[in-house]
């Protein structure tokens, strides 16, 4: 889990 837009996919 990252605090970036990647979090949307997480």
Curated annotation (Swiss-Prot):
Reactions catalysed, semicolon-separated, are: Endohydrolysis of (1->4)-beta-D-xylosidic linkages in xylans
Say yes or no: keyword Hydrolase present.
yes
Which cysteines pair up through disulfides? They are: none
Top-level taxon of origin: Bacteria
Pathway note: Glycan degradation; xylan degradation
Tell me the GO molecular function terms: endo-1,4-beta-xylanase activity
Q: Does the keyword Signal apply?
A: no
The enzyme's E.C. designation: 3.2.1.8
Task: Give the UniProt keywords, A-Z.
Answer: Carbohydrate metabolism, Glycosidase, Hydrolase, Polysaccharide degradation, Xylan degradation
Q: What class of enzyme is it?
A: hydrolase
Could you tell me the Gene Ontology terms of the biological process aspect for this record? xylan catabolic process
As for family, the record states: Belongs to the glycosyl hydrolase 10 (cellulase F) family.
In Swiss-Prot or TrEMBL terms, this protein is called Endo-1,4-beta-xylanase B
Organism, scientific name: Dictyoglomus sp. (strain B4A)
């Amino acid at each position: 889990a990252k605090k970036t837009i990647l979090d949307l996919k997480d």
